[in-house]
Swiss-Prot record:
Gene3D superfamilies: 2.40.30.160, 3.30.70.1630, Aminomethyltransferase beta-barrel domains. NCBIfam families: PRK09559.1, ygfZ_signature. The keyword Cytoplasm applies. This is tRNA-modifying protein YgfZ. It comes from Salmonella paratyphi B (strain ATCC BAA-1250 / SPB7). Keywords: Cytoplasm, Folate-binding, tRNA processing. One of its GO terms (biological process) is RNA modification. Disulfide bonds: none annotated.
Length: 326
């Protein structure tokens, strides 16, 4: 029996979100297994996976030789290897790049569509899950395994949980929370990631940005002490030579349409508007507010005014829940 996804509804902000069970169809799971899996993935991503415990998950980037990101990966350990979650739109291309050198190593790299990805967020999310699982993750133990399920804990923008589980458990959870929780699709989790300042790399922006342009260094996603990995030289140069002039920003306001990933924005300059930046993700909330995640210059004034191209409405900068000070 397959897992049935949930119908879409406009997402809510984290401050007003009722208990919600979220089908993460726009995200996808992959795995690497085999005796060389740690060594192999360590040579491909920006984070130091050798230091990662069974109780941690990490955000990392997989880059090309020029340090541009194919995608960002949410990595965690599994039985004899690792699993990661990324945007579904980039998975196929990312796996193709990751497999390029796999012939020389004892690894198996594969997509995993057998398991289901679910999010649980909103009012009393922890209490709701405590009725289903014997143990839940927290700030100390960010990853917990319970039977067929792996649960990941997220602090921002408010406590939430990501479940990697089998179809039977996904259906059981849906039944248990039915009537108590709202059901929503990936747009709700996307809205929470945008609020949290977690970079969203879809196909339109794959191969476009170095990790620091999306604040990955502030999210613990780059190790400057580990050994070689693809793109390391460019990523290191951006740090030690100050070559990176961009950052990820959160904007909120109104617009007559929801812009697409890859579009630019317009910045108000006196009487005029100048094109700037690149949108990573955008979504409209149930109160009509538009949230936009964009890569722009890192020296913008906090009072800067933006708009979706040629739109009559405006957007403003919202502080992120972490600091970019190094």
């Amino acid at each position: 029996m397959a897992f049935i996804s949930f119908p879409p509804r406009h997402p809510s902000s984290s401050a007003r979100l009722p208990l919600t069970l979220i089908a993460l169809d726009d995200w996808a799971l992959s795995t690497i297994t085999g005796v060389d899996s740690e060594k192999y993935i360590q040579g491909q991503v920006t984070a130091d996976v050798s230091q990662m415990t069974e109780q941690q998950h990490l955000l990392a980037a997989h880059c090309d030789a020029k340090g541009k990101m194919w995608s960002t990966l949410r990595l965690f350990r599994e039985r004899d290897g690792f699993a990661w979650i990324e945007r579904r739109s980039v998975r196929e291309a990312q796996l193709t790049e990751l497999k390029k050198y796999a012939v020389f190593s004892k690894v198996v790299i594969a997509p995993d569509d057998e398991r289901v990805l679910l999010g649980v967020a909103g009012f009393q999310a922890r209490a709701a899950l405590a009725n289903v699982f014997s143990e839940l993750p927290n700030s100390e133990n960010q990853v917990v395994r319970d039977g067929a399920s792996t649960l990941l804990w997220f602090e921002h923008p408010a406590e939430r949980f990501l479940l990697v589980t089998d179809v039977a458990t996904a259906n059981m959870l849906t039944e248990k929370l039915h009537g108590e929780a709202e059901l929503n699709n990936s747009q709700q989790w996307l809205a929470l990631d945008i609020e949290a300042g977690i970079p969203v790399i879809d196909a339109a922006n794959s191969g476009q940005f170095i990790p620091q342009a999306t604040n990955l260094q502030a999210l613990g996603g780059i190790s400057f002490k580990k050994g070689c990995y693809t793109g390391q030289e460019m990523v290191a140069r951006a740090k030690f030579r100050g070559a990176n002039k961009r950052a990820l920003w959160l904007l909120a306001g109104k617009a007559s349409r929801v812009p697409e990933a890859g579009e630019d924005l317009e910045l108000q300059m006196g009487e005029n508007w100048r094109r700037t930046g690149a949108i990573l993700a955008a979504t409209q909330l149930d109160d009509g507010q538009l949230l936009v995640q964009a890569v722009m210059n890192n020296d913008l004034e906090a009072e800067s005014v933006f708009r979706v191209r040629d739109d009559a409405n405006t957007l403003h900068i919202v502080p992120l829940p972490y600091s970019l000070e190094e």
